[in-house]
């Protein structure tokens, strides 16, 4: 086993040893503890599980100062950003608690026994039930909202599934601190032992995916790492679902009318979006399509001017810095891509990098230019008309988001919108894609390579659906039915009865 060390990205120096990498025996023990906790957690009422989630939210909030201090030391994301992220993290738990109490996530459905044109139909009652223990992989870029206390963990616990988290190496101290806070809160609120576990190290993560009691995996990270784990999950003797959120280029299109109407405003919005969090958002607009006319050139010039004035930023880890710098060097050998602008030089210490801007044309757009690059850089792509734009978008991989900056009643936008809708899980109009709201209507997903499963979202209340499976009770006596499927439930939920939606009476 090796030491798991917390490193300060501002200096690149180790700060403390947090833990040791987790061996196979310990992974096995944690998974078996999760398996023992699974039926206990599943048997808890919705109200009881909601209380667990609220206890976690309150415990994290109570330790806000300590969490933000440690997370900032490990990520250099800044206290303002991290305070906002912790607020979001606590809000997620509260929202999932409310979703449990409301109950529609169960998709409770009753078809009473009846005569049909196909003959007699038995009494059928169906709803979603917990899948079992879930493995969650923390993300590098969100030490809170997509890590140990993040949305995958919150949605799995809400669904009634124990969780074993693989901590990310970029912020092990933050992960351990949050884990300790959460375990204590869950225990005090009445959760069974084993409901939450944590492992460290890549080998432990792989062992987690292979372990026979793990029934699903939630992952946010790189395309390369995600594909390896996806293949691992698929090659098990009993393949399990792997819900991976991977690479995303997130195209943003500025229409000719929008460029002409508000060039400076659009430029400021684009720069703010692709540099937010040092450009380390999976929803960062990595390709910006501008019309090849006077207005489009004005937007491009304003973006370049803003980039030139930007100070360097600190990235999360050495690997991200290495890949970011390599991407810039590769452009020297690519005649189709031009270096448009660069901000102030990087600091000599730590994982500092300058903000950068690249440029190409729709006709010259290459595969390399459409690959995600973490960090504060985007590629401007100029297009000469609708056909030119369509041809370029056809080269762009499917993404988590696609953005359209347009004017009202613009026919050009009407033509582009269906193209963008087909290639992303979320279509953004006259806004910027970096923010991802926690809500019932959110889709944070998309077709490969954005994710491994286009049917689900990793953000919002319906993220629970990934960790639930449908079960139908046929001709079951009332005493053996879940409360939500009984004729007279103690705690009613929205149900579809004989094909019609029936809401509880309040």
Predicted regions and their residues:
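Rossmann-like NAD(P) dinucleotide-binding subdomain of oxidoreductase/dehydrogenase enzymes
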Residues: 61, 105-267, 271, 289, ...
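Extended hydrophobic packing segments that form well-structured cores
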Residues: 484-506
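C-terminal core of ALDH-fold dehydrogenases
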Residues: 347-353, 386-481, 503
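NAD(P)-dependent aldehyde/semialdehyde dehydrogenase
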Residues: 268, 290-400
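N-terminal Rossmann-like NAD(P)+-binding subdomain of aldehyde/semialdehyde dehydrogenases
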Residues: 1-122, 505
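Structural signal for hydrophobic packing residues in well-ordered secondary-structure cores
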Residues: 38, 42, 57-64, 68-71, ...
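Short loop-to-beta-strand entry elements in the cores of soluble alpha/beta enzymes
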Residues: 52, 161-174, 195, 238-256, ...
